[in-house]
A protein has these predicted regions:
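ABC ATPase NBD Q-loop/coupling interface
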Residues: 58-59, 70-86, 116
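ABC ATPase nucleotide-binding domains
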Residues: 248-271
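Conserved ABC ATPase signature
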Residues: 145-149, 153
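The feature captures the beta-strand-to-loop junction immediately N-terminal to the Walker
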Residues: 41-43
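ABC ATPase signature
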Residues: 104, 149, 162-163
Length: 271
C-alpha cells in the first residue's frame, strides 16, 4: 500500500531489562508508517521478539520491562495500556509459534479474535468471510480441530484470528518459522494483499531476510539488542553487508561467519 507518510508507531530509544538485571534492548528506535510493511531482521537473540513484546505490552509475563525511552501509537503513549486495551486501539500481535487453541475448531479459533468487538453478529460473520477469502484453505478446514491442522494452516489461522479484531496494525513474529519455502511465499503473498487491499500495516520480525526484504517497504537490522542498519528494503537487499551476513552472499561466493575478515567487519557495526 504505502500511500501515506503518517507515522502510526514510534519506538524511541527504548531499553528493556529482564529480571531487573539483564539488559536485552539497548536504545532501539524504529517507526511504522500508515499503510507500510516494515521488517525487523536479525538472528536468534538479536532482540526482535522482545521489541514486539515491548510494543504489545507482553513483557511483564516474562519479568521484563521497558526501563528507558518511549513507545507511542498515533502520538499517544501506549506503555501503560494492557494488551486488551491495545487491541481495542488497533494493534495486535501474532505470537511466534502460532499458539492456536488446539481443542477448538479453526472457525472457533477465528471467532475468538472478535471478542473485543461491539458490532453485531452479522458484521463479525462478514469479516469471517473476508478472512476466508484470503485464506481459502481455512474455509476448507473450518470444522477441523486446530491441533490437527498443518503448521502452515495454523499460521494462517493465527493471522486470521488477529484480523478478526479489525486491527490497523499487526505485529507479526517469525511468520516463516518451521514452514516449507512454498508456504512461506504463500503467507507473505497474503500479507502483501492484506496490506494493499485492506490497508493493514505490518511490523514483522523475521529471520528469513531474503523473503522479508522482498515483501517489506522498509527494514531494520538488529544485532545484540541494537539497530545496526536500517533503510528502504530494496536498498538493504543490495547492501554488501546485508548480502554478506544475512543473505549469505558476497559477490559470487557464499560467506561464512567463521571467515575472520567477515567477523571483524561485523564487529565494527557494534562499536
Amino acid at each position: 500500500m504505502l500511500k501515506s507518510n503518517d507515522k502510526l508507531l514510534e519506538v524511541s530509544n527504548i531499553e528493556v531489562v529482564y529480571n531487573h538485571v539483564i539488559l536485552v534492548l539497548k536504545g532501539v528506535s524504529l517507526s511504522l508508517s500508515k499503510g507500510s510493511i516494515v521488517a525487523l531482521l536479525g538472528g536468534n537473540g538479536a532482540g526482535k521478539t522482545t521489541t514486539l513484546k515491548a510494543i504489545s505490552n507482553l513483557l511483564h509475563s516474562e519479568r521484563g520491562e521497558v526501563t528507558k525511552g518511549s513507545i507511542t501509537y498515533r502520538s499517544e503513549k501506549i506503555e501503560k495500556l494492557s494488551p486488551s486495551e491495545l487491541v481495542k486501539s488497533g494493534v495486535i500481535q501474532v505470537m511466534e509459534g502460532r499458539h492456536c487453541f488446539e481443542h477448538l475448531t479453526v472457525e472457533e479459533n477465528l471467532l475468538t479474535g472478535a471478542y473485543t468487538r461491539k458490532e453485531g453478529k452479522k458484521k463479525v460473520l462478514e469479516d469471517l468471510e473476508m478472512v476466508y477469502s484470503y485464506f481459502p484453505r481455512l474455509k476448507q478446514r473450518r470444522k477441523s480441530q486446530a491441533g490437527y491442522t498443518s503448521g502452515g494452516e495454523q499460521q494462517m489461522c493465527a493471522i486470521g484470528r488477529a484480523l478478526m479484531s479489525k486491527p490497523e496494525t499487526v505485529l507479526l513474529d517469525e511468520p516463516s518459522m518451521g514452514l516449507a519455502p512454498q508456504l512461506v511465499e504463500e503467507i507473505f503473498e497474503i500479507v502483501k494483499k492484506l496490506n494493499e487491499n485492506e490497508g493493514v500495516s505490518f511490523l514483522l520480525a523475521e529471520q528469513n531476510t531474503n523473503v522479508a526484504l522482498r515483501f517489506a517497504h522498509f527494514g531494520y537490522i538488529l544485532e545484540s539488542g541494537r539497530v545496526v542498519m536500517d533503510g528502504p528494503a530494496e536498498e538493504l537487499r543490495e547492501n554488501p553487508d546485508v548480502k554478506e551476513f544475512y543473505l549469505g552472499l558476497s559477490g559470487d561466493k557464499r560467506k561464512s561467519y567463521r571467515d575472520g575478515r567477515s567477523y571483524r567487519r561485523r564487529k565494527r557495526w557494534l562499536n
